[in-house]
């Protein structure tokens, strides 16, 4: 990101202890862990405001695990890593539910679970293999060799520990409960590692911070070149209908290997997202926040095909920018040559599943050293 000479006219200098960059779910969680677990004096800053990025634009799915079926995660990462990351998602859910329980305002959550659905016979075979692997690890699921919704799907896995949440309000309550000072609308444009501190240049303030934690996900490559090739901004698109007189899907629904997703909202509407698989050239590797007419035409067709009973008109459409990791796992570490700058980024569309536990490990690694386990960027040095 850049800031003009004129925009720095009111810039001040300030010395602080622990700076979190990014006021989404990961940033709010990092602020909580840094302040409440490690006793740091925390300031959070963001180019916009709390929850205005992907944290407040996603579908609100708390779905366990990674963005690939469990048996494929075992094949790709090894059994130990797949099991560890699954556990991280459950730990994140525990943190989110605790924040919701202690929230000073209502944060809606629906604990009815999720349903992973197969759109083809081939995907049904994949779901069966995933179900076997999950059951072998004694993970609580139920497998259906048919479509439990009677909507033209081929098979399903029900994950009862999953949930749907209002993600924007969750981001707001996490930040509120962190106790950190917030400086919004404040773009970061330069980082310098000095002796014993980091000089952080932002539009409003030049911070002299003892520690910096980047929770900037999709926008990380714009902050430091280290992230180029490691985190790719990727656009997602959603729509929501006018209120309905029925509930089409009593779960968070997830199909076509996660490319399509749908749920009922807390105000009785139907939310549908996806369409990126059919438009990857335009939707991948972009941070441009805009609607893609091709994607939304596909979503409209999909709605009619699988949910013909949803006849209410579309009320709203939007997009959000996800941060896709180069290997599908979140990234935790410190910047090369900047040992006091840590990061927790690259959630690959699964920030609600992984952001809290990842931020927890990232803060501990920055302050105490040691390994962040499966999400530590040291894995790239070993490969």
Per-region residue spans from a language model:
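Glycine-rich active-site loop/strand segments that organize a redox cofactor
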Residues: 57-88
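Extreme N-terminal leader/targeting segments of oxidoreductases
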Residues: 1-18, 36-37
């Amino acid at each position: 990101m850049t800031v003009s000479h004129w925009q720095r006219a009111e810039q001040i200098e300030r010395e602080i202890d622990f700076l979190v960059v990014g006021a989404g779910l990961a940033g709010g969680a990092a602020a909580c862990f840094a302040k409440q677990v490690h006793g740091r004096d925390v300031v959070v800053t963001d180019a916009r405001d709390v929850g205005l990025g992907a944290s407040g634009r996603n579908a609100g799915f708390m779905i366990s695990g990674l963005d690939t079926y469990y048996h494929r995660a075992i094949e790709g990462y090894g059994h130990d890593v797949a099991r560890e990351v699954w556990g991280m998602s459950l730990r994140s859910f525990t943190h989110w539910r605790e924040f919701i329980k202690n929230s000073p305002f209502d944060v809606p959550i629906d604990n009815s679970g999720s349903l992973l659905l197969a759109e083809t016979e081939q995907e049904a075979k994949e779901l069966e293999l995933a179900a076997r692997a999950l059951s072998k690890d004694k993970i609580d699921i139920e497998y259906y060799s048919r479509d439990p919704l009677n909507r033209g799907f081929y098979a399903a896995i029900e994950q009862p520990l999953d949930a749907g949440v209002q993600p924007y309000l969750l981001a707001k309550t996490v930040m509120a409960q962190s106790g950190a000072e917030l400086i919004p609308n404040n773009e970061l444009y330069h980082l310098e590692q000095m002796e014993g501190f980091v000089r952080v240049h932002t539009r409003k303030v030049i911070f002299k911070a003892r520690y910096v934690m980047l929770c900037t996900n999709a926008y990380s490559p714009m902050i430091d070149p280290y992230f180029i090739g490691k985190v790719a901004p990727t656009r997602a698109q959603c729509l929501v209908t006018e209120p309905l007189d029925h509930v089409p899907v009593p779960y968070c629904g997830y199909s076509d290997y996660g490319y399509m997703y749908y749920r009922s909202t807390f105000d009785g509407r139907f939310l549908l997202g996806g369409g990126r698989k059919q438009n990857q050239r335009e939707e991948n590797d972009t941070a441009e926040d805009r609607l893609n007419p091709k994607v939304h035409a596909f979503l409209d067709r999909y709605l009619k095909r699988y949910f013909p009973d949803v006849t209410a008109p579309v009320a709203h459409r939007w997009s959000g920018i996800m941060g896709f990791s180069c290997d599908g796992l979140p990234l935790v570490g410190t910047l090369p040559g900047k040992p006091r700058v840590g990061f927790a980024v690259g959630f690959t569309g699964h920030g609600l599943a992984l952001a809290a536990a990842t931020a927890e490990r990232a803060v501990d690694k920055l302050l105490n050293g040691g390994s962040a386990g499966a999400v530590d960027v040291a894995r790239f040095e070993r490969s």
